[in-house]
């Protein structure tokens, strides 16, 4: 089940495996949510929305794993969803601020430089896993419902 999308993302290409470190703290859903999101890697847009679909992708993954999601197509809606955690944890939702809008994805690990690795929809027009600058993320939220 893979598909394609339309664009957002300043994330770099996935680094070599030797540069990736697993997060020291696994979070709620670190297998279920991450595994579900990974099924869509490399594919296009599985959401049916023609643009700005990162939040729609996040809601879809949450619903497929038994969570309610926010029901919003706005990435910023996830800044009030679940329980805030202090830093990147596997399974946490990362909310990013960006000029002209925001972006949201699920944390899968931390790279050797300490940057979170995240799966997100609408990253270079597809579902992608890539490190992002930790300074771009303003909220880490653990799903609780």
Q: Can you say where each PLM-predicted feature lies in the sequence?
A:
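Intrinsically disordered, low-complexity
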Residues: 1-45, 115, 132-145
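Detector for methionine-enriched segments
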Residues: 1, 58-60, 74, 96, ...
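Generic serine detector
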Residues: 6, 18, 23, 30-31, ...
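Catalytic cysteine-centered active-site loop
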Residues: 38-90
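...with weaker cross-activation on analogous glycine-rich loops/strands in unrelated enzymes
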Residues: 67-131
């Amino acid at each position: 089940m893979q598909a394609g999308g339309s664009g957002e993302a300043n994330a770099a290409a996935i680094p070599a495996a030797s540069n990736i470190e697993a997060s020291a703290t696994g979070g709620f859903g670190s297998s279920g949510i991450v595994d579900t999101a990974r099924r869509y890697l490399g594919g296009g847009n599985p959401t049916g929305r023609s643009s700005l679909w990162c939040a729609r992708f996040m809601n879809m993954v949450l619903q497929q794993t038994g969570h309610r999601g926010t029901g919003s197509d706005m990435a910023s809606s996830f800044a009030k969803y679940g329980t805030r955690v202090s830093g990147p944890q596997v399974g946490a939702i990362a909310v990013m601020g960006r000029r002209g809008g925001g972006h949201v994805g699920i944390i899968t690990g931390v790279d050797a430089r300490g940057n979170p690795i995240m799966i997100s929809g609408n990253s270079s027009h597809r579902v992608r896993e890539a490190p992002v600058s930790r300074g771009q993320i303003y909220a880490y939220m653990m799903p609780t419902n």
